[in-house]
């Protein structure tokens, strides 16, 4: 069994953040570990408050994991402050893990900022160069590049521009576009397009976390970047198709569809 680490924020409602990451790791037959960088008081409808963990505690959590159970892949999610980013970058540079997948989370599903605006420069300088795969959505890619992204060609141009910042590969997620959901992967050499029909549901809380964690799990399990992204796209699409209509806002995806089917708990 492969060991995976998520470095991200905690979502007490269970739909996103480390909770979504750990569910995704388990669904892919891997052992999940977590380093919490922020505690987020949120639910399906709103973000109430955010409490950031100190950089020193972030580093101690990372030391605790890496000195004992070295991860086969690392997923990085919400990093809200420059100081937190620098702490994570310092330890990743020290331990040099493989298969680092970075989801540059900037906003919650309801639009609440999860990354301080002045932290984007630090993200570009310290975190992006450590990524084997970066997974921004269109608004995040626009913030990183300063571009306006309206077409698939724009997504490709943004992917190239961000890849030049030091990451080895990038998936620009097209879920914010009208029409089918098209994701553009640039692996540093060539482009791949992954397209699925858009599912008409509001219950998409945690989809970005789930997608990036699935990529990390697939890489740890030995798949190529292109196959890892393809399989992650299929996994998250099914999770959205069977999403859970719970809460008063945007409900979460269903991370264990296949497991529930095999157990006879879901038709």
Regions picked out by a protein language model, each given a short descriptive name:
Residues 2-6, 26-109:
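Conserved N-terminal subdomain of the carbohydrate kinase-like
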Residues 7-13, 191-205:
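Short pre-catalytic strand/loop immediately N-terminal to key active-site residues, enriched for Gly-Thr
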Residues 14-30:
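N-terminal basic/disordered segments at the start of proteins
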Residues 19, 142-143, 201-225:
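Short, small-residue alpha-helix embedded
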Residues 29-33, 191-192, 218-232:
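Phosphate-handling active-site elements
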Residues 52, 226-267:
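Charged C-terminal helix
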Residues 117-191:
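Conserved phosphate/ATP/ADP-binding segment of small-molecule kinases
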């Amino acid at each position: 069994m492969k060991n995976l680490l998520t470095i991200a924020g905690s979502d007490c409602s269970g739909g996103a953040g480390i909770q979504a990451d750990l569910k995704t790791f388990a669904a892919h037959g891997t052992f999940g570990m977590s380093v919490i960088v922020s505690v987020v008081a949120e639910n399906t409808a709103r973000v109430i408050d955010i409490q950031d963990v100190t950089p020193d505690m972030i580093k101690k959590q990372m030391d605790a994991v890496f000195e004992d159970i070295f991860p086969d892949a690392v997923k990085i999610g919400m990093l809200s402050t420059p100081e937190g980013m620098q702490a994570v970058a310092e330890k990743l540079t020290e331990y040099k893990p493989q298969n680092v997948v970075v989801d540059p989370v900037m906003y919650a599903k309801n639009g609440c900022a999860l990354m301080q605006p002045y932290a984007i420069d630090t993200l570009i300088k310290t975190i992006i160069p450590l990524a084997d795969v970066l997974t921004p959505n269109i608004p995040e890619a626009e913030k990183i590049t300063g571009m306006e992204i309206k077409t698939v060609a724009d997504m490709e141009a943004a992917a190239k521009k961000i890849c030049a910042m030091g990451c080895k590969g990038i998936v620009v997620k097209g879920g914010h576009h009208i029409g089918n959901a098209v994701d553009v992967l640039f692996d540093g050499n060539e482009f791949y397009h992954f397209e699925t029909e858009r599912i008409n549901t509001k219950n998409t809380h945690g989809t970005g976390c789930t997608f990036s964690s699935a990529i990390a799990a697939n890489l740890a399990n030995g798949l190529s970047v292109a196959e890892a992204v393809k399989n992650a796209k299929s996994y998250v699409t099914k999770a959205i198709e069977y999403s859970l209509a719970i809460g008063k806002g945007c409900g979460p995806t269903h991370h264990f569809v296949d497991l529930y089917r095999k157990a006879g708990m879901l038709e």
